[in-house]
Amino acid sequence: MLNAAAVACIEQVRLGFVASVSPKGTFVVLDERKIAFAEIRSPGTISNIGHSPEVEVNFVDSFRRKGWRMRGVTQILRRGSADFEEIFPKWDALCADLSARIRAIVVIKVSEVKPLSTPPYDDGVTEAEMIALYKEKYAKMYP
């Protein structure tokens, strides 16, 4: 389900936008069918998932302007549960400074993965050209 390019995007970018809630910067790949994020300060996200466990997440490389759209069903693992404790070390290693505040881990069983890209690729722009363009844009924004 998750191919090498999608895995690399998640592992490099970490920031995934869950539809109708808020961006989560703690995503990890658990296996080829599961991704997950740490719930640190997301009561709205947890409430929304409680009402509807189906979610979509977008991961986009800001410079390449490419990414992945994933759809799946969530499972909330609460701190103290055996399932939480089993996978928690991934976040303790990734963001040790925040790990004490992680209240839950939200696992998404991925059922669909689609690539995303910006329209200039349709016109023949290369990744190298997109990266150069956005490096220049960001350099102007943040000199």
Model regions and ranges:
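A generic local structural motif
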Residues: 2-4, 44, 93-94
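Short, structured patches in soluble enzyme cores that scaffold and shape functional sites
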Residues: 20, 61, 109-112
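Sterically constrained small-residue positions within well-ordered secondary structures
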Residues: 9, 28, 48, 61-63, ...
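Short, structured beta-strand-loop surface elements
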Residues: 41-90
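Short hydrophobic-aromatic micro-motifs
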Residues: 35-38, 106-108
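N-terminal structural module
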Residues: 1-37
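Generic beta-strand structural signal
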Residues: 14-16, 53-55, 66-70, 102-106, ...
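C-terminal edge-of-domain segments
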Residues: 75-143
